[in-house]
Amino acid sequence: MSSSQNNNSSWIDWFLGIKGNQFLCRVPTDYVQDTFNQMGLEYFSEILDVILKPVIDSSSGLLYGDEKKWYGMIHARYIRSERGLIAMHRKYMRGDFGSCPNISCDRQNTLPVGVSAVWGKSTVKIHCPRCKSNFHPKSDTQLDGAMFGPSFPDIFFSMLPNLTSPLDDPRT
């Protein structure tokens, strides 16, 4: 973390600004602080202090090393909430996650997906709702797939009924 970084920015601001992390959406502070959303996550009180306070020099020894995992697991929960789905919907409609490389899908927008909900099993993939295939993203991202989970695309389309899933397109 650079010392020239704005002192009012948090670890979250810094983390979301890293190249390759553009698939992630900002999890609001109130969601992060809600103890219900932290259930089952280890060391949440210590890590919560780090990710919400203004960024400090990482050489100070106040970073635990699990911040990325902790934020990723909170993110996976958040994107299943109403507010999280709205944030991901905006990114989907803008094409932030890329498009399907399959020519027959006609550059269909994709969604991020993890092949496992277990941390450390695989990096994030992109899922095409038209051909139902998963692909490696073109962007330079090494995000863990657990930050999205294997069911995110299904949840996304089932919770946003105003979207017609390309799977329902009679032309396919």
Curated annotation (Swiss-Prot):
Induction: In wild-type flies, it is strongly down-regulated by double-stranded RNA (dsRNA) interference mediated by Su(Ste) transcripts. In males lacking the Y chromosome, the absence of Su(Ste) locus, relieves such down-regulation, explaining why it is strongly expressed.
Family matches, as InterPro entries: Casein_kin_II_reg-sub_N, Casein_kinase_II_beta-like, Casein_kinase_II_reg-sub
Role this protein plays: Unknown. In males lacking the Y chromosome, its strong overexpression leads to the appearance of proteinaceous star-shaped crystals in the primary spermatocytes causing meiotic drive, possibly by interfering with normal casein kinase 2 activity.
Gene Ontology terms: cellular component: cytoplasm; protein kinase CK2 complex
Designated name of the protein: Stellate orphon protein at 12D
PANTHER family documented for this protein: CASEIN KINASE II SUBUNIT BETA
Miscellaneous information on this protein: There are multiple copies of the stellate gene in fruit fly, encoding proteins that are extremely similar, which makes their individual characterization difficult. Thus, most experiments probably do not discriminate between the different members.
Family listed: Belongs to the casein kinase 2 subunit beta family.
Record's subunit section: Interacts in vitro with the casein kinase 2 alpha subunit (CkII-alpha). The relevance of such interaction is however unclear in vivo.
Entry comment describing in which tissues the protein is expressed: Probably not expressed in wild-type flies. In males lacking the Y chromosome, it is testis-specific and constitutes the main component of star-shaped crystals.
Pfam families found in the cross-reference section: CK_II_beta
SUPFAM superfamilies: Casein kinase II beta subunit
Signal peptide range: none
GO MF annotation: an example: protein kinase regulator activity
Coiled coil: none
